[in-house]
């Protein structure tokens, strides 16, 4: 077993920009900077985790909408910090993002509240599994048991862009989740993988049986081997894209100058 552990976020960062991967995972150049979209998404995840965790651990059977919004508001205020950024050409203000979160939760409550009777089994579940001698780790937003041998993996999304069915079958993150749970629960004969988009309250789902898991596994191993080769040869490359506008490493990057075109929010 190789010593390094790999996650979707680690592999995906390498694929998007291997130089940024170096700054974060090799140089350990950690920064407190955080995009407002990521901050909002994190707090929505925390609020939904709170709902279902209390249901699982305390058998809570009823929630008022006020209690949910209050939890979200307190989490927002407690976690807000001076290193939160937004792309400077976006006109939305701090209050606009906060209100977006409230709207997500209100709509979610209208569909699933006040009792939230889904068959939720685990929330924010940490998993690790072996793939070709590599340790793959992940944190799954939610796992539902929808029958004695059926598992439903749900990943919350606060962005507007929805994947197509074809894109879901090829999605690395969901593929990792599916492989992980199929190895942890080998008796399970059906694993459903879903994105739940809070902006539209829609599922986009694919059954793991419809995913070419052998090809996916081979591709993931090749991806990790490419990372190892790049680390060994130190051949990191800056990949310029629109994602640079949200990058916190402009001062360190040889193809950029000065500060990121994002600005701190107040």
Predicted regions and their residues:
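Mg2+/Mn2+-dependent nuclease catalytic core
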Residues: 118-120, 125-222
């Amino acid at each position: 077993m190789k010593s390094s552990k790999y996650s979707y976020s680690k592999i995906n960062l390498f694929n998007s920009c291997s130089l940024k991967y170096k700054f974060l995972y090799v140089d350990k150049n950690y920064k407190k900077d955080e995009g407002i979209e990521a901050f909002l998404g994190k707090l929505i995840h925390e609020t939904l985790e709170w709902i279902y965790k209390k249901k699982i651990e305390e058998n809570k059977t009823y929630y008022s909408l006020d209690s949910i919004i209050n939890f979200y508001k307190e989490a927002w205020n407690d976690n807000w910090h001076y290193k939160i950024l937004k792309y400077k050409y976006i006109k939305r203000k701090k209050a606009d993002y906060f209100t977006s979160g409230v709207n997500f939760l209100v709509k979610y409550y209208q569909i699933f509240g006040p009792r939230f009777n889904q068959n939720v089994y685990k929330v924010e579940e940490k998993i690790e599994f072996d793939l070709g001698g590599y340790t793959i780790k992940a944190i799954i937003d939610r796992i539902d048991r929808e029958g004695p041998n059926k598992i439903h993996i749900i990943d919350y999304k606060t962005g507007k862009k929805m994947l197509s069915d074809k894109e879901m079958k090829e999605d690395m993150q969901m593929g990792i989740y599916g492989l992980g749970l199929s190895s942890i629960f080998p008796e399970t004969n059906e694993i459903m993988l879903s994105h739940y988009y809070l902006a539209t309250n829609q599922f986009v789902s694919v059954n793991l049986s419809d995913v070419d898991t052998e090809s996916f596994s081979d591709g993931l191993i090749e991806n990790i081997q490419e990372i190892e080769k790049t680390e060994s040869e130190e051949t990191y490359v800056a990949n310029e894209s629109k994602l640079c506008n949200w990058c916190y490493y402009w001062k360190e990057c040889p193809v950029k100058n000065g500060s990121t075109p994002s600005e701190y929010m107040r």
